Amino acid sequence: MGEGILKNKSMNFAIRIVNLYNFLKETKQERIMSKQILRSGTSVGANIREGQFAESPADFIHKYSVAQKECSETLYWLELLNKTNYITTEQYVSLDTDCTELMKMITSSIITRKKSLSLTPNH
């Protein structure tokens, strides 16, 4: 899978998360969960970018694994925001779908990199 696609999707997702943060802060007057989802949702792309310039395959796997965990945390905050009526089901489903797709792409990249490591001599 092209790393450029993942880079672009994670940036677009981060933009959506920033917009959600602004909506929650300004419209719903919510401050705690919005900061949590802002941190985790924008961290996904930041870790992907760091991983793309990793110093070693192990560093790549580590950065992408952190991005994977941040996706998981973001999914938690999205679900909580939906279940507490801060976001609509439509907003939730749309963001959840994007985040889940990102997580699958990240997981696929990790698996591919691990497989390539196992095929490389001396690893």
Please place each PLM-identified region on the residue numbering:
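Short, C-terminally biased terminal segments at protein or domain edges
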Residues: 1-123
